[in-house]
């Protein structure tokens, strides 16, 4: 009886040792996984940043991937023109040439028939429309209605997109917009660590899903679009997009969920902001602004507005000004961010 008890005790100790070793191994593995959340309002550029991470740190996009997004390119291009044509009616803007009415009817008929193929006839009609003074005037007022940021890019490239031999480029892919629903994830290895980057849809209806991603987060990259200071939300056509972004940043930055988490702020679409700020004053969003109407001073003011919302004296907000469609710019910024996250992770592990 005593012999059996002794044998059982030894077996129990061996089992406990194996369990302890597995726990230590699991803890070591978990410390080597860096979980990043990409958060921000809808259309801020989160999905584009995620695509850039795949290009820069994973296997990029194959030829098949590029060919598969051709219908999305066509759809984005056609719907961009459709948005302008609808806005012309509501803003009561006349076409520069009467013949453009017939061209616009072809665009409406194509969408109504659910045939979003960029045929030669449709492409030529859209090119004529895009060069029409009335259409250009309507596009200039694009902050007054809803239209994708990529509209000008795709419409400028209509001759290339409508070529029979057209294959989308990586830049075309970066410019495409598909509303993010649910959770999208990219995994990549860097300097012995596994980065798990998660993008969740930013529209109000999607934010309830964010809670499922909050566990074991190492850092948050919050993305806000600089160029949307004079635009309203697609969801309600009423709320200012920049004010919505500030409100969302406030709630996330000061949430108890993220009290000990590194916070990175990307003020995105600086290229579009540079074009817009010369003709649309920042006071549209911030009536109290008294500074110069130039890119640098206005961006610094917007950055200050975000940083003022941080109520923790222990937390530093790491801010970067980005253009999500510029791979070189994103690489420079991401390298700095990831190096900072790695250094702080090693410090938390007691390795530096």
Curated annotation (Swiss-Prot):
Entry's family note: Belongs to the G-alpha family. G(i/o/t/z) subfamily.
Organism: Caenorhabditis briggsae
Lipidation sites (S-palmitoyl cysteine): 4
Chain sites annotated for binding GTP: 40-47, 174-180, 199-203, 268-271, 324
CDD domains: G-alpha
Subunit structure and binding partners: G proteins are composed of 3 units; alpha, beta and gamma. The alpha chain contains the guanine nucleotide binding site.
Pfam families for the chain: G-alpha
Known role: Guanine nucleotide-binding proteins (G proteins) are involved as modulators or transducers in various transmembrane signaling systems.
Segments for region (G5 motif): 322-327
Full protein name: Guanine nucleotide-binding protein alpha-7 subunit
Residues covalently joined to lipid (N-myristoyl glycine): 2
The keyword Transmembrane belongs to this UniProt entry's keyword annotation: no
Domain G-alpha: 32-352
